[in-house]
């Protein structure tokens, strides 16, 4: 019996007690929904397999003492199929012990779940166990990473790549249609600074400083070897196309009042660099994401909002709703009407659009586009965007939507890359930062994705490079992957020994170690549902680590495949000791049951790792 089935049973009993007049003043409408009646795993196994606090939840509403209300609950539970014992403990806890067959039923449930149909989206051989449809019918637009196209993806963006894709997988496993979207900021001042930086690098590489050209990187510009690389690529591409950048620069250069060069190339050459370099960065970012196993459904270009008139249209929509006013020569969004701390300029007094104007148009587009309009627009933003939440939620409300429902904003905290307890700066190409490609080159995609997804994105996080590169149980991804590989090795040994679980009697899974593994397997569906509802995919990773720990302990305590004297795993050369080891061998029927349990663990680990975008290895 699964925890979900127990919760449903408890809910049914609550309604039956109301009908029978055994629940005091409690009425049906005061009974919480099933998902609020979750059972818990007792820390002390002497207290049973599962515990419920239903009596304490409802005692006040029933006008009864918790223990008095717990007694009829316990009596009804004791009559249910699959339950061996029920006890009322403490102030009103109900401790439930399942019979061995009922507890072991989860093994059949896991292995009988159908294979997923969209196999091309999965890394591992996954099945439907744990997946549900409670978010079915919803289209969720999940925008993440969205780093400016002015350099490689840094470690903060890498965290969002790992967390965002894991979140998308978790939401899809709960029935939602998820649109993974990357917002490509190819408009605005940061692109101008990028182009200026490239022009300066080009001028320096071509020794144009003596001619008065600006060769120093602008104080607000971008630095790093990648700037020099891209500048050289732009020059080579331009020359291949018959464009003379030096001639353009001379055309732009101009002279000051003394007849000397102004020292900074202007619009023509800068535009040439912009239009060639931005697509180059776009291609590089796309490749980095693909190599990191993140496949976006939509790459949305900010420039298109202006080119297609969507910014003007969105402002007109807000104007029609009475939320736009003019003041001091500028156009303002009256966001204070909707909870913001101050009103926001959207068109400056010089006629230029403020950055927020594009955000307004972008949200409106997400909600009303022809293909896959979003029921919920989820934004995953960095810690430096915390002050942006108020205006975004105000804009959502101004469009008649519900903040927190139609728009959700998740803020991620900082990541520090450490080695031997000290911060690491390992990128020669991008200057004083760590990039996605740097991290992957050191620890690999699996370790990078798992480590970044296993921590709550609301908290600062330190990555230990030495730990992630190690093959020890202290390395979380190794620990979980090794559990899967170990289970595969059990299968290989069982095949050699001629053991099959066909027709296995799962009631023989009756030891304490067996029970711990069974309970862990049963919790996977609720973990997956909670991870989706809370928008916290790290809960899947933490569950996998607990399952792996339970499995490794079980493996060391309960033998699955019988040992023979010639087994390489036989310990030592002492024949008496070997005989003692062999005496621990399970009888064939119990070995078959344990093999089936082994394969159920294997399946759940494969399912869970797939949700994190991490492979489940056959061998390690």
From Swiss-Prot:
Catalytic reaction list: tRNA(Arg) + L-arginine + ATP = L-arginyl-tRNA(Arg) + AMP + diphosphate
Subcellular location: Cytoplasm
SMART domains from the UniProt entry: Arg_tRNA_synt_N, DALR_1
The protein's Enzyme Commission number: 6.1.1.19
Lineage summary: Bacteria, Bacillati, Actinomycetota, Actinomycetes, Bifidobacteriales
GO molecular function: arginine-tRNA ligase activity; ATP binding
GO cellular component terms attached to this protein's record: cytoplasm
Chief localization: cytoplasm
First-tier enzyme category under EC: ligase
Intrachain disulfide bonds: none
Protein name as it appears in the record: Arginine--tRNA ligase
Family annotation (SUPFAM superfamilies): Anticodon-binding domain of a subclass of class I aminoacyl-tRNA synthetases, Arginyl-tRNA synthetase (ArgRS), N-terminal 'additional' domain, Nucleotidylyl transferase
InterPro entries for this protein: aa-tRNA-synth_I_CS, Arg-tRNA-ligase, Arg-tRNA-synth_N, Arg-tRNA-synth_N_sf, ArgRS_core, DALR_anticod-bd, Rossmann-like_a/b/a_fold, tRNAsynth_Ia_anticodon-bd
Regions that span the bilayer: none
Family per similarity comment: Belongs to the class-I aminoacyl-tRNA synthetase family.
Biological process (GO), any one: arginyl-tRNA aminoacylation
PROSITE patterns: AA_TRNA_LIGASE_I
Subunit structure: Monomer.
'HIGH' region (motif): residue ranges: 147-157
Record keywords: Aminoacyl-tRNA synthetase, ATP-binding, Cytoplasm, Ligase, Nucleotide-binding, Protein biosynthesis
């Amino acid at each position: 019996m699964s925890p979900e089935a127990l919760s449903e049973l408890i809910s049914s009993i609550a309604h039956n007690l109301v009908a029978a007049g055994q629940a005091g003043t409690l009425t049906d409408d005061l009974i919480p929904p099933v998902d609020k009646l979750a059972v818990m795993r007792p820390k002390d196994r002497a207290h049973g397999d599962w515990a419920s606090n239903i009596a304490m939840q409802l005692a006040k509403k029933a006008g009864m003492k918790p223990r008095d209300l717990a007694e009829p609950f316990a009596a009804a539970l004791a009559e249910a199929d699959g339950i061996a014992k029920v006890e009322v403990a403490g102030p009103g806890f109900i401790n439930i012990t399942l019979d061995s067959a009922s507890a072991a039923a989860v093994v059949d449930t896991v292995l009988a779940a159908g294979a997923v149909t969209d196999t091309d989206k999965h890394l591992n051989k996954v099945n439907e166990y744990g997946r549900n449809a409670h978010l079915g019918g919803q289209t969720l637009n999940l925008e993440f990473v969205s780093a400016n196209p002015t350099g490689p993806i840094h470690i903060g963006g890498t965290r969002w790549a790992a967390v965002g894709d894991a979140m998308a997988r978790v939401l899809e496993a709960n029935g939602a249609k998820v649109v993974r979207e990357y917002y490509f900021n190819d408009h605005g001042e940061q692109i101008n600074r990028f182009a200026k930086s490239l022009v300066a690098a080009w001028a320096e590489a071509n020794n144009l400083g003596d001619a008065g050209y600006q060769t120093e990187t602008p104080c607000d510009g971008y630095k790093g070897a990648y700037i020099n690389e891209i500048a050289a690529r732009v020059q080579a591409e331009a020359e291949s196309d018959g464009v003379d950048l030096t001639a353009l620069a001379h055309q732009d250069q101009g002279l000051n009042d003394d007849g000397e060069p102004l020292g900074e190339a202007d619009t023509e050459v800068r535009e040439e660099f912009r239009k060639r370099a931005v697509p180059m960065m776009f291609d590089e970012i796309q490749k980095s994401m693909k190599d990191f196993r993140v496949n976006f459904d939509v790459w949305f270009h900010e420039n298109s909002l202006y080119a297609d008139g969507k910014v003007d249209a969105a402002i007109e929509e807000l104007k029609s709703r009475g939320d736009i006013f003019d003041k001091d020569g500028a156009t303002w969004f009256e966001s204070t009407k909707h909870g913001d701390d101050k009103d926001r300029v959207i068109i400056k007094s010089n006629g230029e659009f403020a950055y927020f104007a594009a955000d307004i148009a972008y949200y409106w587009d997400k909600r009303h586009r022809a293909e896959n309009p979003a029921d919920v627009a989820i934004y995953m933003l960095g810690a430096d965007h915390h002050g942006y939440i108020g205006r975004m939620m105000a804009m959502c409300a101004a469009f008649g939507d519900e903040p927190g429902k139609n728009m959700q904003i998740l803020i991620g905290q900082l990541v520090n890359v450490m080695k031997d307890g000290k911060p690491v700066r390992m990128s020669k190409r991008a200057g004083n930062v760590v990039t996605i490609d740097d991290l992957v080159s050191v620890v690999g995609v699996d370790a990078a994705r798992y480590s970044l997804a296993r921590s709550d994105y609301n908290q600062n996080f330190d990555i230990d490079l030495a730990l992630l590169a190690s093959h020890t149980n202290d390395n979380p991804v190794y620990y979980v992957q090794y559990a899967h590989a170990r289970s595969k090795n059990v299968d290989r040994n069982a095949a050699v020994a001629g053991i099959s679980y066909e027709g296995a009697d799962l009631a023989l899974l009756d030891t304490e170690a067996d029970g711990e593994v069974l309970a862990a397997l049963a919790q996977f569906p609720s973990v997956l549902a909670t991870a989706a509802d809370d928008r916290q995919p790290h809960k899947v990773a933490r569950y996998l680590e607990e399952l792996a720990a339970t499995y490794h302990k079980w493996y060391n305590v309960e033998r699955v495949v019988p040992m023979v004297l010639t087994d390489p795993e036989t310990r030592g050369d002492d024949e008496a000791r070997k005989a003692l080891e062999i005496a621990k061998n399970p009888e064939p029927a119990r070995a078959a049951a344990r093999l089936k349990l082994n394969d159920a663990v294997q399946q759940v680990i494969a399912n869970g790792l797939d949700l994190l975008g991490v492979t489940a290895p056959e061998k390690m």
